């Protein structure tokens, strides 16, 4: 699963997801892409689940690019802990995804196979997604 090797700080504020994605919203590498329609946090496990689906379809013929990286730590406290006494320890990592952000790109496989693969990968995501084809960019 994806996670940063080193970070400046162990813990982060939650923040808020306003507006649409300004960067990473166009196809850059592949021919087909999976684009987010809603804002959300996508965990490293969800990214990995989508990657497994796509690599199964792509095989040796094509190439896959993961365009998001989980760089935000999410902290949790032990259940049954009383209020106070600081913030919990980091449990997992998430990628902050705004609407319009490209999640995955693939290249080197047929249109039919690519749309099928991206559709299944979209089911693994916690948000609504859209499949982009080369001429729709």
From Swiss-Prot:
SUPFAM superfamilies assigned to the protein according to its UniProt record, in alphabetical order: Ribosomal protein L16p/L10e
InterPro entries: Ribosomal_uL16, Ribosomal_uL16_bact-type, Ribosomal_uL16_CS, Ribosomal_uL16_dom, Ribosomal_uL16_sf
UniProt keyword list: Chloroplast, Plastid, Ribonucleoprotein, Ribosomal protein
Disulphide bridges: none
Annotated TM spans: none
One record GO biological process: mitochondrial translation
Gene Ontology terms: cellular component: chloroplast; mitochondrial large ribosomal subunit
Annotated stretches, region: Disordered: 1-21
Subunit annotation: Part of the 50S ribosomal subunit.
PANTHER family in the cross-refs: 50S/60S RIBOSOMAL PROTEIN L16, LARGE RIBOSOMAL SUBUNIT PROTEIN UL16M
HAMAP family to which the protein is assigned, alphabetical: Ribosomal_uL16 (MF_01342)
Protein name: Large ribosomal subunit protein uL16c
Taxonomic source organism: Oedogonium cardiacum (Filamentous green alga)
């Amino acid at each position: 699963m994806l996670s940063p090797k080193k970070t400046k700080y162990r813990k982060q504020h939650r923040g808020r997801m306003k507006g649409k994605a300004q960067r990473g919203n166009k196809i850059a590498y592949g021919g087909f892409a999976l684009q987010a329609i809603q804002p959300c946090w996508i965990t490293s496990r969800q990214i990995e689940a989508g990657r497994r689906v796509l690599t199964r379809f792509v095989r040796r013929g094509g190439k896959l690019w993961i365009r998001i990286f989980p760089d935000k730590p999410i902290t949790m406290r032990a259940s049954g802990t009383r209020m106070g006494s600081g913030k919990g320890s980091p449990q997992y990592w998430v990628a902050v995804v705004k609407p319009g952000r490209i999640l995955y790109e693939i290249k080197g496989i047929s249109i039919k196979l690519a749309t099928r693969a991206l559709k299944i990968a979209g089911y693994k995501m916690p948000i609504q997604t859209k499949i982009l084809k080369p001429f729709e960019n």
